[in-house]
Amino acid sequence: MAPAKNQENINQKLALVVKSGKYSLGYKSTVKSLRQGKAKLIIIAANTPVLRKSELEYYAMLSKTKVYYFQGGNNELGTAVGKLFRVGVVTILDAGDSDILTALA
């Protein structure tokens, strides 16, 4: 029961980031923000292809950015950020009022 509760908690924190913080969606913008050093946290969906996931992990390691692996697929991640389309990667640039950076550390 704890994983479902934890997932709901993360979804709420993501919704708060969308309302009050800065974020970007997608692989290309994530790599760009990682290379510029602007990303604070990246959230990767569970069904992201392995090669793409490893590239994101590599860039995150270079920029010393935290990586969180979302337990749902890209459909669920898109719904969590309030979009009606699939989202493979979410980059948190500024958490706003959310404590997602400390909660997922």
Swiss-Prot record:
* Example of a GO MF term: RNA binding
Keyword tags: Ribonucleoprotein, Ribosomal protein
InterPro entries xrefs: Ribosomal_eL30-like, Ribosomal_eL30-like_sf, Ribosomal_eL30_CS, Ribosomal_eL8/eL30/eS12/Gad45
- Superkingdom, according to UniProt? Eukaryota
Q: Does the keyword Ribonucleoprotein apply?
A: yes
Cross-referenced PROSITE patterns: RIBOSOMAL_L30E_1, RIBOSOMAL_L30E_2
Q: Name one GO cellular component term.
A: ribosome
Q: Tell whether Chloroplast is among the UniProt keywords.
A: no
Please give the coiled-coil regions recorded for this protein: none
| Pfam families registered for this protein in UniProt | Ribosomal_L7Ae (PF01248)
What's the family? Belongs to the eukaryotic ribosomal protein eL30 family.
Instruction: From the Swiss-Prot or TrEMBL record, give the protein name.
Output: Large ribosomal subunit protein eL30
